[in-house]
Each structure stands twice: as structure tokens, then as C-alpha cells.
């Protein structure tokens, strides 16, 4: 068959088109997978001061209820409600008229019995009176002397004085009111606010754990600062003055399972008032060679266990189950599962899994592990 010029042009073109179509069916080889990059923090052992934050209430250092010790009508109130008073300062004046008369009568009776006792003393020497008569006269004199002292005390009690220095509250009585010795209601109450008590409660389990750690050497006592306490107010501000631990209760409350701890704080400006809700920060002790792990690198699995991903010497990811004791600042205090020198992953966690080889760079989302903020940890922040 003889090819025409048109066929000679068409055949090579078809061959080229078929070759091109067959080339389109072949897929290119995928590029090699890139090694994921993660941000890590290298852990270092450090000395950490452990604090516990506990809720509490303020209480007056001393409380004295002012009550009358004699009966009578109130003539004057001599203080301003809500003011500061001194011990021995007069607060009320009870009508003294009756007690002044009793005192004068007792003095007159004393003079009479004293004169008679002295006369009988001379007469008994001459046997003009019996020894019994002299003894009776001397006893009457002594009774009169005691009556004068009692009348003087009652007269003094018409001036109602403050038993302690402190701030006095509102007055429960006014001028013209009748008050009686031994009445149930106080006339006023004086509270000493400087210093002031702070009573906090700590679970007995936490107290037992603290004692065990101190006994085993896991914790060291914080020396001169062992009994120091700081205070956070209800609005979140820090109280500027430091207090000291006074005592802990000798028994555990059966209803709450807690122990009461009392601290005392200086309060020169009366900034703290009785009944305020506060948070006391108690220094437990010092932990040597503590491991602090950034919170960004600690997660929990389905069982609720704290876990962390670390990069081993072969640059591969390892899963560690750890024991996170408490939060200190923005880090977890880890007591098991991590060691000094471990490289904990804090960035890129979502791109890796155990066994994967990774490329490490210093993390940017956390501060240096060497600059741990040893802020107080609440007792409920343990993991």
C-alpha cells in the first residue's frame, strides 16, 4: 500500500501523542518524610522551698466583754464607739451616790470600833473587862475595817474601766439604763487587734505526710523560717507583714478530719479585722534535688495518670508515667518518673508519638527550668 504525504505526517504525530499519554499514567516517587521538630526543656535538679496555702479566718488576739460589777444607773458613756481605748480607761460612770454614802458610813463605823478596841485593850490589862469582851471588840474592829474596804471597792466599781487595750465596739447601753452586777449581756466588747490571730485548718492526712517526709529526710526544715507564715487577703492582695506559727491543735476534728493551726500576725494599722477570710501560706520545708517539670509538658492519660514525653539519647520519643506531687508556680514538682538531664517535650506534642525520631530545639513557650517560681501551692493541687 502506498502512503500518501498526509499519512506520512499523521503517523508520527499519533505515536508522539500515544507516548505522551502513556507517560501521564506514571506517578512520581513521594519525597522522604521530614523529621518532626519539637521544643524541649532540659530538667535540672534544684533546691525548692515548699509552701502550703490553706484557707482561714482572722480572730482577735484578746477579747474582753465589759460588764458592771455593781448595780446602778448609767450616768455617762465616756468613749466613742469604734475607737481605740487603753487598758484602765474609764468607759462608763454609774451613779455613785449610794456607794459614796455606804463608804462614809463604813468609815464612821470603823472609827467607832477602832476606838472601842483600843479602850478594851487597856481595860483588859487592869482586868476591868474580860478577855472575851476584848476579843469581841477587836473582831468588830476588823470587820469594820473589811467593810470599809468593800465599800471602797464598790465605789471604785462605779467607774467602769476597760480591762484591755484595743478597739471597742458599739455600746449596748445608754445613759439612764439600769445595769446589774452579773448581768448576762455585756455593756460593750473590747478586742485587741494588734497582733491578730489567723486560724487555718489543714487535713490530717497532709500533716501526716509532712511529718513522714521530714522524718525520712525527703524534706529539710527551713531553719529560722520554719515557723514563718505569709498571708493573702480576700481580694487577692498580699499582706505586707509576715507572721509566725503559734501552735497546732492537739486533736483532729472528727467531723472534718482536719487540724486547726494558729498563726499570729502584727497588725499595727488594723488592716486585718476579726472574721476576715484569708489564705495563709505556710512554709513546710526545703526539698533538695527537686525536679520541676513545665506544666505544658505534663498531660494525663485515660487512667488519670500524669505522663510526659521525653527525648532519649537516640533522639527518639519516650512516654514516661510520672508522679506529680504539687504545682509550684507554673511547674509540677515531680517525685517519680523524671530525672535531672531529661529532655521533656513542651512544644509539638501533637505531632509526635512514642518511638518517633525527632529534631529538638529549645522551647519558647516556657521559662528556663532554672528559674522556677517557688510560689505557694494549694493543698488541692497535688497530682
UniProtKB/Swiss-Prot annotation:
Miscellaneous comment as given in the Swiss-Prot or TrEMBL entry: In both X-ray crystal structures approximately the last 100 residues are not ordered.
SUPFAM superfamilies hit by this protein: HlyD-like secretion proteins
Membrane topology (UniProt): Lipid-anchor
GO molecular function, one term: efflux transmembrane transporter activity
Effect of inactivating the gene: Disruption of MexA, MexB and OprM significantly reduces active efflux of N-(3-oxododecanoyl) homoserine lactone/3-oxo-C12-HSL/PAI-1, but not N-butyryl homoserine lactone/C4-HSL/PAI-2.
Keywords from the UniProt entry: Antibiotic resistance, Cell inner membrane, Cell membrane, Coiled coil, Lipoprotein, Membrane, Palmitate, Signal, Transport
Protein name (database record): Multidrug resistance protein MexA
Lipidation (S-diacylglycerol cysteine): 24
InterPro entries cross-referenced by the UniProt entry: CusB-like_dom_1 (IPR043602), CusB_D23 (IPR032317), MFP_Efflux (IPR051160), RND_pump_MFP (IPR006143)
Gene: mexA
Pfam family, one: CusB_dom_1
Outcome, altering residue 170 to D: Abolishes complex formation and thereby decreases drug resistance
Parts forming coiled coils: 97-151
Family from the record: Belongs to the membrane fusion protein (MFP) (TC 8.A.1) family.
Signal peptide boundaries: 1-23
Regulation: Export of antibiotics and solvents is dramatically decreased in the presence of the protonophore carbonyl cyanide m-chlorophenylhydrazone (CCCP), therefore may be driven by a proton gradient. Antibiotic efflux is inhibited by pyridopyrimidine derivatives, such as ABI-PP, acting by binding to a hydrophobic pocket in MexB.
Gene3D superfamilies: 2.40.30.170, 2.40.420.20, 2.40.50.100, Helix hairpin bin
Principal location: membrane
PANTHER family: ACRA/E-RELATED COMPONENT OF DRUG EFFLUX TRANSPORTER (PTHR30158), MULTIDRUG EFFLUX PUMP SUBUNIT ACRA-RELATED (PTHR30158:SF3)
Record localization: Cell inner membrane
GO cellular component terms given for this protein: efflux pump complex; plasma membrane
Impact after mutating residue 57 to A/D: Abolishes complex formation and thereby decreases drug resistance
Induction: By growth under severe iron limitation.
Keyword field contains Cell inner membrane: yes
Subunit structure: Component of the MexAB-OprM multidrug efflux complex, composed of six MexA subunits forming a hexameric tube, binding to a MexB trimer, which interact with the trimeric OprM outer membrane channel protein. OprM is thought to not directly contact MexB; instead, MexA joins MexB and OprM by forming a funnel-like hexamer anchored to the inner membrane. MexA may initially form a hexameric ring complex with MexB prior to OprM, then OprM undergoes a conformational change as it contacts MexA, allowing the periplasmic gate to open.
GO biological process, one term: response to antibiotic
Amino acid at each position: 500500500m502506498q502512503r500518501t504525504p498526509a499519512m506520512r505526517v499523521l503517523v508520527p504525530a499519533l505515536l508522539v501523542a500515544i507516548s505522551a499519554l502513556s507517560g501521564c499514567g506514571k506517578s512520581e516517587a513521594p519525597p522522604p518524610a521530614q523529621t518532626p521538630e519539637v521544643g524541649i526543656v532540659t530538667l535540672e535538679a534544684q533546691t525548692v522551698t515548699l509552701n502550703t496555702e490553706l484557707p482561714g479566718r482572722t480572730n482577735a488576739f484578746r477579747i474582753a466583754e465589759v460588764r458592771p460589777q455593781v448595780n446602778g444607773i448609767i450616768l455617762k458613756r465616756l468613749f466613742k464607739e469604734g475607737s481605740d481605748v487603753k487598758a484602765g480607761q474609764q468607759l462608763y460612770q454609774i451613779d455613785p451616790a449610794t456607794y459614796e454614802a455606804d463608804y462614809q458610813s463604813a468609815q464612821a463605823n470603823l472609827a467607832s470600833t477602832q476606838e472601842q478596841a483600843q479602850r478594851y485593850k487597856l481595860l483588859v490589862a487592869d482586868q476591868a473587862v474580860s478577855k472575851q469582851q476584848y476579843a469581841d471588840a477587836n473582831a468588830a474592829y476588823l470587820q469594820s475595817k473589811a467593810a470599809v474596804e468593800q465599800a471602797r471597792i464598790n465605789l471604785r466599781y462605779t467607774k467602769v474601766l476597760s480591762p484591755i487595750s484595743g478597739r471597742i465596739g458599739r455600746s449596748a447601753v445608754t445613759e439612764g439604763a439600769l445595769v446589774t452586777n452579773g448581768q448576762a449581756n455585756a455593756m460593750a466588747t473590747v478586742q485587741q487587734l494588734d497582733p491578730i490571730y489567723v486560724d487555718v485548718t489543714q487535713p490530717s492526712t497532709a500533716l501526716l505526710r509532712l511529718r513522714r517526709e521530714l522524718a525520712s529526710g525527703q524534706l529539710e526544715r527551713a531553719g529560722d523560717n520554719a515557723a514563718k507564715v505569709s498571708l493573702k487577703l480576700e481580694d487577692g492582695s498580699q499582706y505586707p507583714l509576715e507572721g509566725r506559727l503559734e501552735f497546732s491543735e492537739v486533736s483532729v476534728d472528727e467531723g472534718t478530719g482536719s487540724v486547726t493551726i494558729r498563726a499570729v500576725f502584727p497588725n499595727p494599722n488594723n488592716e486585718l479585722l476579726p472574721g476576715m477570710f484569708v489564705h495563709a501560706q505556710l512554709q513546710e520545708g526545703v526539698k533538695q534535688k527537686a525536679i520541676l517539670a513545665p506544666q505544658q509538658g505534663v498531660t494525663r492519660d485515660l487512667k488519670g495518670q500524669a505522663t510526659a514525653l521525653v527525648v532519649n539519647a537516640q533522639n527518639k520519643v519516650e512516654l514516661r508515667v510520672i508522679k506529680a506531687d504539687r504545682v509550684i508556680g507554673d511547674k509540677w514538682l515531680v517525685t517519680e518518673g523524671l530525672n535531672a538531664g531529661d529532655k521533656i517535650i513542651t512544644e509539638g506534642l501533637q505531632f509526635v508519638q512514642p518511638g518517633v525520631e525527632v529534631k529538638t530545639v529549645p522551647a519558647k513557650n516556657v521559662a528556663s527550668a532554672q528559674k522556677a517560681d517557688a510560689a505557694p501551692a494549694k493543698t488541692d493541687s497535688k497530682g
